[in-house]
Amino acid sequence: MAPKAPKWRELADRFAEQIRTGDYGPGEQLPQIRDLVEAGEGSKETVHRAYKALETEGLVAMSRGHGTVVRRKAPLKRLGIGRYDKAKWRDGDEVAFIADRVASGRSYRRNEQTQTVSRVKASAAVATALGLPEGADVYARARLVKEGTQPTHTLTSYYRPEHVEGTRIVDPTPGPAGRGGGFRVLYDAGYEIDHMTEEIFARVPSAEEAQLLQLAPGEWVVELHRTTRTVDGTVVEFAIGVHAGTRFAWSYDFKVPDSAMTEAEDESK
């Protein structure tokens, strides 16, 4: 027989179920700790530990003066392939983070993306991705993206200087790099993006990341590595993103490949 869960866990599970079924809606406050103690739900320490567990699981936010409140919004959709649709940024002005907001039915302002641009020495990972010696000069465009006042993620793109020198990509003005963003800048410079490789993994955040992204205690981040190439294989961007784990739902919609069919087509040519 499995051991009985501690009382704080039982209390946390009960509130979690009530949140999921809508008994407590987004923005609604859970009972005060002292009220639950008086109602016989456990000691102050028990109730506080239950609420901290709910916060760690991303269901509530705890703050002085506001108590324990159910998180207001569902995670943002982070589109996989669709966010890079050329028609969005080449022919329009829907850069990747805006495409995510549109898909999520959420509002946005261009200045919710801020950035700093600097010329730095390439780390081993950056140098390998861009095909440069370690320590070579590269441009780093570091962005912090927010939804309203809440940070959602950081994204730092690295470029060879000869690809972006004198372009809007090295302009630190808040918001995307002009109409269509960085991919449109590369397109106009003769570096049309053709294919990408993305790698994602979850990890524990650093103390600095937890503070910058305003993470709940125990919340993990999802790190993204994106390598962007032209049709001839030239790497024109290597990017590292750090996303608040509970603020995104990663969404992919793609045609299922059939390598046997592709090989047959190649042989018939």
Curated annotation (Swiss-Prot):
- Using the record's annotation, list all stretches that form the HTH gntR-type domain: 5-73
UniProt keywords (A-Z) are: DNA-binding, Transcription, Transcription regulation
Gene3D superfamilies tied to this protein: Chorismate lyase-like, Winged helix-like DNA-binding domain superfamily/Winged helix DNA-binding domain
The record, for CDD domains, names: WHTH_GntR
Please list the GO biological process terms of this entry. Answer: negative regulation of DNA-templated transcription
Write down the DNA-binding region ranges. Answer: 33-52
Q: Which GO terms describe its molecular function?
A: DNA binding; DNA-binding transcription factor activity
Positions the record marks as coiled coil are: none
- The superkingdom of the source organism is Bacteria
Give the protein's biological function.
The imp locus inhibits the extrachromosomal maintenance of the Streptomyces plasmid SLP1.
PANTHER family, per database record = GNTR-FAMILY TRANSCRIPTIONAL REGULATOR, MANNOSYL-D-GLYCERATE TRANSPORT/METABOLISM SYSTEM REPRESSOR MNGR-RELATED
Q: What is this protein called?
A: Uncharacterized HTH-type transcriptional regulator SCO4628
Q: Which organism is the protein's source?
A: Streptomyces coelicolor (strain ATCC BAA-471 / A3(2) / M145)
